[in-house]
Amino acid sequence: HSYRVAAACADAGAELFQLNQGLFETNSLGRLRLQGWLVENALFLAEGNIVICALPRSVEQELGLVEDDVENISGFPRSIEGVKIAATLRQEENGLIKLSVRAVPGYDAAAVCAKFGGGGHKGAAGASFAMSMEDAVKAVAAAMPEME
């Protein structure tokens, strides 16, 4: 469907370069800072096949992030070369941990999240639970599948 939409936009006279740049190539400075911080502080397991990124509330404040900077950040760790399953933990204002897991085919994000009372599907799943960030990272690491 994306190609058909792009073709319709082109036929209608849309400036495709500007459209593409606005949708896919432009990030706020806050979002880029966040991505750098996540990579620097990520926990890589199973020879880089698994990554866990934890975002404490204090870091959001320290980096001066706004909600748009953090929106859909759960897909970012999965974009790291070689990563097959990625977990992002974000501490919400109420203190709960929001877990988002993304996986490539052959791995089950929902199975990881089910261990924390959550759900979803094999490619993307989530859960929210009460736990300290440090304990949550350890628990999520323990819940990850064995890599073959």
Question: What are the language-model segments listed below?
Answer:
Residues 98-101:
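Primary mode marks residue(s) on the alpha4-beta5-alpha5 output face of response regulator receiver
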Residues 117:
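Aromatic-lined ligand-binding clefts that engage carbohydrates, nucleic acids, or primary amines
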Residues 108-112:
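Short, glycine/polar-rich helix-capping loops at beta-to-alpha or helix-loop-helix junctions
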Residues 104-106, 133:
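Helix N-cap motif at beta-to-alpha junctions
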Residues 1-85, 91-95, 129-147:
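A structured phosphate/pyrophosphate-recognition subdomain
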Residues 121-129:
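Short acidic/histidine-rich active-site segments
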